[in-house]
UniProtKB/Swiss-Prot annotation:
It comes from Solanum demissum. One of its GO terms (molecular function) is ATP binding. Confers resistance to late blight (Phytophthora infestans) races carrying the avirulence gene Avr1. Resistance proteins guard the plant against pathogens that contain an appropriate avirulence protein via an indirect interaction with this avirulence protein. That triggers a defense system including the hypersensitive response, which restricts the pathogen growth. The keyword Repeat applies. This is Late blight resistance protein R1-A.
Length: 1293
């Protein structure tokens, strides 16, 4: 109805006018809504006045009555009284808009009374008609076309919806009492509308063939409209209950189909049956439209014979399943079944409407009686409906599956199948045989999946990956069907059919594999190259290649030039290497040694001002001195004061807008000491805006020589390319369009291939000329050649924010929880995942930003912006991952009806998660990232609480990963999400519910507290020890306790590897806990004891323990000596130790590589003696804020030490001279120590560099007091060191 749009515009104009005059009251708004409601119904009736059938419906009688009432009010009678009332109401709307104040009644009460009395007189002459059209009365009217009928029904439904939604008793549109009957009428009208739509869409003959049906539908809708308009709302009736009962009676006539035909043999059902039979005869030629009009199958089952109650209940359940799944199914998934679908829908309609016409129904009517009366076999007629429902349900589920999968999903399923059958034996008993067959089939396919991972370059790679994808998709289906069975969401007959289909499809997949002999060949052949691709650990060569002239020019600007502050701006397109070039200059020893302070930050498109300041402060003054709880402006002032007296070098990377520079420039004071700022950006305008003295540098493209040099370096490292490959290599380098990022990505492809001319020629041919200046094409090619087990891992980077460093331990835990990692006998999943990551690093798809000094493993990484954008876009295309950003993504409703439910969702806003929750039933993971401040203060925290999440999480029933670590504070743990494997969040409560054991799949549990909160105790329930799959229990901000009496009778957690932070008040408790966790690898705990119990003088930690952190709670003495044969990392905090204790500890820790002593006291003598041979494998020694005065170290101690860090050791006399002779030493850092420590550090460097020619040695001195002068020195160059040592030693002396 076009008039509805006119009314909407009219209403908006009135509201705008009243708001301009003065604030529109709620009463005025309600009056406007009331008149709009009346106008919409009147408009509907106006459209019906000219119908030839109107006289039979009583319409004209009512119109005549309205004319009489007009005369009574001395108003000239209009030709059409409905039009008259429409005009009157429009005038009243104008009156309200002029005087919107509720106190200015302006005769409204009088008009309301007139309208109500008018309706009363109408009702006195009007009764709900008991007749339908006779068979021989068919009216050929243009307005009975299906489009008009559907619009008319939509208008009536819209007005009824208004009444249902209003719950305010003071509203003029409020309907008292239960509204179930109105809602049921709404359902009936929607059904009728679906029916009209279905007939219209499927009809291939002229529409007038079904005029009887369309006219009947219009009559029913018009009478419902008349009943509602005349009787509701009941604002003018004192006896509202009586009016409500009268309306209920009238609506019941419609509901119970008491509209009888003039001719006894014609009924509403006859009309429906006739039109369905006509459609059935033309189905083969019907239009191929979406079958979503299957809403017609939502037929009510009231008023049916008692004998059909059970059969009809089953039928109704089937039809609901069909409808619910059809509306979420794309037409492409049914393109070969549309005719069958139409046939089933029509048959269902025929079946139901036939059942209404059976005469003489009795209480004891049997199924045989019904079949005889209907003339067909009811159960047999239902079978095609079952078959179609089964097909549609499977298609509806399959269309939501991602096209990229983790090959570890079968491992997860096989474990769960066993657990499910044990936990839910009653629910799954009837499926026992099918589940055993499925389990056996999946187990038989495990060797094949192993081959897919270990032989990614197999000649049958495409076939293998296609089969692997099909296998994983079947695993998803089995999981869904089993869950649906347990929760009784799908009927038993459907589940049985579905599992049988799955078994048949798995058999077909196996036959396909066996046909190509892939399984037999790989099982019988000794694989020479097994998992070499997983085990290798390539290192990224950080040495920059090319741009020699640019680097030299920029180096001069940094070291020479103006005495004032200068900004060196570098701009250019993505992928040119701006960040790599800037980092190369920033870390150039000839550059940074000339500056007192060096600091850097990365901005990116979405940034946090506070985060930027914090990053700069951490570099400028050290992590320990940064006060994160301060406001951003206070931190900025701290940074400015820190830089003020120094010569500084600042790197500001990836600036997108001028406003960023406006925010930061005030932090960088100019005191004419040649301080420099390097700024990179994609935009020339930003570079020009930030420039001070030097002109912005537009970074050029590579030339052909540089392109080949970079390609050769990335593929061959320090080796040279063979002459046979050089020609094709030069051609490939040229194809990369002189873009460094493209060259690096192509090098990643070549490095994975055999060094043969044929292979390289194939790459050159596949790349083609189209890749010039198109880095996306290169990324796509790099992605295409990835083995399938790495594709999911790579795309998962799309869940992270741009320009953010990614913690690799967290990334690997997420990969494992997402089932991306395929298990391999005898290997830890973490080790396999590290191999996957190193493979991606070796392909130049992932950049390492930090590696562990002790073992060289990557600790942090990031992606180039171009690669990250690719991951987000491709992941969305593959139904794999969708990044939900408030500024970029439309409302979830659009996604619901495009039928894409992605496997993984990444959010930046809590409200986005709430909005999308109802649309994400199949989602497997939710990651909520924080794009603003990384650190929260008490001023920020109130906006971060969102306990509404507890109400929406049950919608994510298949959730396996829920990572809320970076944004949300919750007051609950979602114990109903039984599939959950990874859960991370901030909490404020001091206990964990015992129901946490419901999360029997949970492998990683990370709970943190607000940074502003004081450290408190968190009680662990004994049921935690029932969670046998738990691998990482990380609760760092609490003192976690569990009663020893409860622990004694609990099970062992054999899979637990990480435990933090547990509190022990007795050594006995610690010993008991260690027995219950025999495979721990990382333990962080607090201890509180007074003395050594003799029986616990040596506490034996688990043999696999590698990381141990011990914190003092109250008493300073450690009540045990540590014995951990494979311990590599030890941190002791707050204890009082002596040389004997540390000597005994060293004897038990032969493999220790990292030792950190923090705020440790050394007794009355404040002395530490380290004897010969102690700490033989130690690589890193950090001493922080110790009370140590005298440190004596034997010549043969610390023989493999590489790093020595002293921080805040103000009383230490000196660093022992034996460190001069440790040839493995590479680094000494001295922060906030006295002058004697600095002097000894300088002497050590002088000996290391000059005497032993240790060119890798590096000394960093930060913030020590020397004649009231603050210093930060970063010395590595021999000449710089020589001059600095001479000058500083001279001052010290």
């Amino acid at each position: 109805m076009n008039f509805n749009n006119e009314l909407s515009d009219l209403k908006n104009r009135f509201l705008f006018r009243t708001l301009r005059a003065q604030k529109c009251s709620d009463v005025a708004r309600d009056r406007i809504d009331f008149f709009i409601w009346e106008l919409k119904f009147l408009n509907c009736f106006l459209h019906l006045q000219s119908f030839a059938f109107a006289s039979e419906c009583g319409m004209l009688d009512i119109s005549q009555k309205m004319i009489e009432i007009c005369k009574r009010f001395n108003t000239p009678p209009p030709h059409n009284s409905f039009a008259y009332w429409k005009e009157v109401i429009c005038k009243r709307l104008c009156a309200i808009s002029i005087q919107p104040d509720a106190s200015s009644d302006d005769g409204f009460a009088c008009w309301k009374k007139v309208i109500w009395k008018t309706k009363q007189e109408f009702r006195a002459k009007y009764s709900f008609p008991k007749t339908l059209l006779a068979d021989n009365k068919v009216y050929d009217d243009d307005d009975t076309n299906p489009k008009f009928v559907m619009e008319f029904i939509d208008a009536v439904v819209g007005n009824l919806n208004v009444l249902v939604k209003i719950n305010d008793p003071s509203s003029l549109l409020f309907v008292p009492g239960p509204k179930e009957q109105i809602e049921q009428v709404l359902k009936e009208l929607k059904l009728l509308r679906f029916f009209v739509c279905f007939v219209s869409n499927k009809c291939i003959e002229p529409q007038y063939q079904h005029t009887t049906f369309y006219t009947h539908a219009l009559i029913e809708a018009s009478h419902i409209a008349m009943v509602v308009w005349l009787n509701l709302p009941i604002y003018g009736n004192r006896n509202q209950d009586l009016a409500s009962s009268e309306v209920s009676c009238l609506l019941s006539d419609f509901m119970e189909m008491k509209i009888k035909s003039i001719q006894p043999d014609i009924s509403r059902n006859n009309i429906y049956i006739d039109v369905l039979r006509a459609l059935k005869s033309t189905i083969p030629q019907a239009q191929d439209k979406h079958a979503a009009e299957s809403g017609i199958v939502e037929t009510p089952t009231h008023n049916l014979m008692v004998g059909l109650s059970d059969q009809m209940a089953n039928l109704q359940e089937m039809l609901c399943l069909l409808r619910d799944n059809l509306i979420h199914l794309p037409i492409l998934d049914l393109e070969f079944h549309l005719q069958d679908m139409d046939s089933v829908i029509v048959d269902a309609g025929l079946l139901i409407y036939s059942l209404y016409d059976i005469k003489g129904q009795k209480e004891d009517t049997t199924l045989e009686d019904i079949n005889q009366a209907l003339g067909f076999d009811l159960p047999r007629n239902i079978e095609p409906i079952k078959a179609m429902i089964n097909l549609v349900m499977q298609k509806a589920f399959q269309c939501n599956l991602p096209r990229i999968h983790g090959l570890g999903y079968v491992d997860f399923l096989l474990k769960n199948l066993k657990d499910f059958q044990g936990r839910y034996s009653d629910s799954l008993d009837f499926l026992k045989n099918q589940l055993q067959v499925i389990q056996t089939e999946f187990e038989s396919l495990q060797p094949f999946l192993k081959v897919v991972v270990e032989e990614p370059h197999n000649k049958l790679k495409t076939l293998n990956e296609d089969c692997a994808t099909q296998i994983i998709r079947k695993a998803y289906e089995v999981e869904y069907v089993v869950d649906a069975c347990i929760n009784k969401e799908v009927p038993q007959w459907c589940i049985e059919r579905w599992l049988l289909d799955i078994i048949e499809e798995i058999t077909c997949i196996k036959a396909k594999i066996q046909e190509k002999n892939t399984v037999e060949d790989t099982m019988k052949t000794v694989i020479a190259r097994t998992s070499s691709k997983l085990a290798r650990t390539p290192r990224m060569n950080e040495e920059i290649v090319g741009f020699e002239d640019v680097i030299e020019n920029l180096r001069k600007k940094l070291l020479n030039g103006t005495k004032g502050q200068d900004v060196i701006s570098i701009h250019g397109m993505p992928g040119l290497g701006k960040t790599t070039l800037a980092n190369s200059l920033y870390s150039d020893r000839s550059v940074f040694s000339q500056f007192d302070i060096c600091a850097q930050c990365c901005v990116s498109q979405v940034y946090s001002y506070k985060d930027l300041i914090l990053a700069l402060l951490r570099d400028a003054i050290g992590e320990g001195s940064v006060r994160r709880e301060l406001h951003a402006n206070e931190l900025a002032d701290m940074l400015r004061k820190t830089l003020l007296p120094r010569r500084y070098l600042i790197l500001v990377d990836d600036v997108w807008e001028n406003s960023v520079w406006d925010d930061l420039r005030g932090c960088f004071p100019d005191v004419n000491n040649r301080s420099r700022i390097i700024l990179t950006t994609r935009h020339h305008e930003v570079a020009k805006y930030a420039s001070v003295h030097s002109d912005p540098l537009h970074l050029r493209m590579f030339d052909e020589v540089e392109s080949w040099k970079l390609l050769e370096k990335k593929v061959f490292g320090e080796e040279s390319c063979s002459p046979l490959l050089k020609n094709v290599g030069l051609r490939i380098a040229k194809m990369c369009g002189q873009l460094p990022l493209s060259i690096v990505l192509v090098a990643g492809i070549l490095s994975e291939m055999e060094k043969e001319v044929e292979c390289w020629e194939q790459v050159a041919n596949n790349l083609g000329s189209y890749i010039h200046n198109d880095s996306r094409a290169i990324v796509d090619k790099s992605y295409h050649v990835l083995p399938c087990h790495l594709k999911s891992c790579f795309l998962y980077f799309g869940a992270f924010l741009e320009d953010r460093v990614i913690d690799i331990s967290r990334l690997i835990r997420l990969w494992i929880s997402e089932a991306f990692i395929k298990s391999s006998e005898g290997r830890r999943l973490e080790d396999i995942a590290e191999g996957y990551l190193e493979n991606l690093i070796g392909r130049n798809l992932v950049m390492v930003t930090q590696r562990s000094i002790s073992d060289g493993k990557a600790k942090e990484c990031r992606l180039h912006d171009v690669l990250l954008d690719f991951c987000k876009e491709r992941a969305a295309e593959e139904n794999f991952l969708l990044w939900i950003n408030r500024d970029q993504i439309t409302k979830p409703s659009s996604c619901v009806y495009s039928h894409k439910q992605h496997a993984h969702l990444a959010f930046t806003e809590m409200h986005n998660l709430v909005e999308w929750s109802a649309s994400c039933s199949f989602v497997g993971s939710v990651v909520l990232s924080n794009k603003y401040d990384s650190y929260f203060s008490t001023r920020d925290i109130s906006s971060l609480h969102d306990f509404s999440i507890s109400r929406i999480l049950p919608n994510f029933k298949f959730l396996k990963v829920l990572d809320l670590e970076h944004r949300v504070f919750i007051d609950f743990i979602p114990t109903e999400l039984v599939y959950l494997k990874y859960f991370s969040a901030h909490i404020e409560q001091n206990s964990i519910p015992s129901s946490i054991s419901n999360l029997w799949n949970l492998e990683t549990l990370i709970l943190k507290s607000p940074i502003y909160a004081l450290r408190c105790t968190l009680l662990l329930p004994s049921t935690v020890w029932d969670m046998v799959k738990l691998r990482h229990l990380y609760i760092p901000d609490f003192s976690t306790r569990i009663e020893a009496a409860l622990l004694e009778n609990s099970a062992k957690l054999y899979n637990l590897e990480t435990l933090s932070t547990l509190y022990f008040s007795r050594v006995e408790d610690a010993e008991l806990m260690l027995r219950k966790t025999p495979n721990l690898r990382k333990l962080i705990c607090e201890v509180e004891c007074l003395e050594y119990p003799p029986q616990y003088h040596v506490l034996n930690f688990p043999i696999r323990l590698e990381i141990l952190k011990l914190y003092r709670s109250k008493f300073k003495t450690i009540p045990f000596c540590i014995s951990a044969p494979n311990l590599k990392y030890l941190k002791l905090c707050g204890f009082s130790l002596d040389s004997q204790y540390l000597s005994e500890t060293a004897d038990h820790l032969k493999h220790l590589e990292v030792l950190i002593l923090y705020k440790v006291e050394f007794g009355d003598h404040r002395e530490w003696k380290v004897s010969n041979g102690k700490f033989p494998q130690l690589k890193i020694l950090k001493l922080e804020y110790l009370s140590l005065v005298k440190w004596i170290v034997a010549d043969d101690a610390f023989p493999n030490l590489e790093q020595l860090v002293l921080r805040g050791c103000q009383d230490l006399m000196e660093i022992p001279s034996c460190f001069m002779d440790i040839l493995s030493l590479k680094y000494i850092g001295v922060e906030y120590c006295n002058e004697s420590v600095v002097k000894s550090a300088l002497n050590i460097q002088e000996t290391q560099v000059e005497d032993y020619q240790n060119t890798n040695f590096k000394l960093v001195l930060i913030e020590f007091s020397l004649q009231k002068k603050a210093w930060k020195l970063n010395l590595t160059d021999a000449e710089d060191m020589h001059n600095a040592v001479k000058n500083i030693l001279a001052e010290i002396r």
